[in-house]
């Protein structure tokens, strides 16, 4: 309850145009409350910018896909010719094939075209990294 009261107060101050400096290790709070961020690790600023811009910078062009198909082999042949594919696990109401597909420099519509020719798409979501994922990746890559 106290965390919600604080969160509501921060959001109210933000709505009034106040600048709030927020220091936390809880990255889910950062995503919920902040517009601009600076990720600091061991006194080094690793990333700075608007949350959306930071996430765009770290996007991987990966999609979580669910598809109902009568021809799994044909579908897999078609998509592996153009894209990198791995199994996915997500909740679904269907007994669909679940895949993670990395499209590289291709447009999402190219993937959708291949999928819709081979079955009924039941799930299509871009996998956007969380701020926590970005922080871990950045710290690991910089070995700081």
Describe the function of each predicted region.
Residues 2-5, 9:
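Short alpha-helix in the ABC/ABC-like ATPase nucleotide-binding domain
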Residues 9-102:
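ABC transporter nucleotide-binding domain
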Residues 1, 33-36, 57, 114, ...:
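Residue-level signal for well-ordered alpha-helical positions
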Residues 7, 55, 132-136:
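Conserved protein kinase catalytic domain
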Residues 100-144:
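C-terminal coupling/interaction segments
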């Amino acid at each position: 309850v106290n965390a919600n009261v604080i969160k509501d107060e921060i959001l109210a101050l933000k709505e009034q145009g106040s600048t709030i400096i927020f220091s936390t290790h809880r990255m889910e709070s950062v995503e919920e409350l902040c517009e601009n961020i600076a990720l600091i690790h061991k006194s080094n600023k690793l990333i700075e910018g608007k949350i959306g811009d930071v996430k765009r910078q770290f996007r991987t062009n990966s999609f979580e896909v669910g598809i109902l198909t009568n021809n799994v082999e044909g579908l897999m042949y078609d998509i592996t010719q153009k894209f990198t594919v791995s199994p996915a696990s997500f909740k679904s109401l269907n007994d669909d094939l679940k895949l993670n597909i990395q499209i590289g420099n291709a447009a999402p519509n190219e993937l959708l075209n291949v999928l819709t020719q081979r079955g009924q798409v039941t799930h299509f979501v871009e996998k956007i990294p969380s701020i926590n994922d970005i922080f871990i990746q950045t710290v690991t890559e910089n070995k700081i």
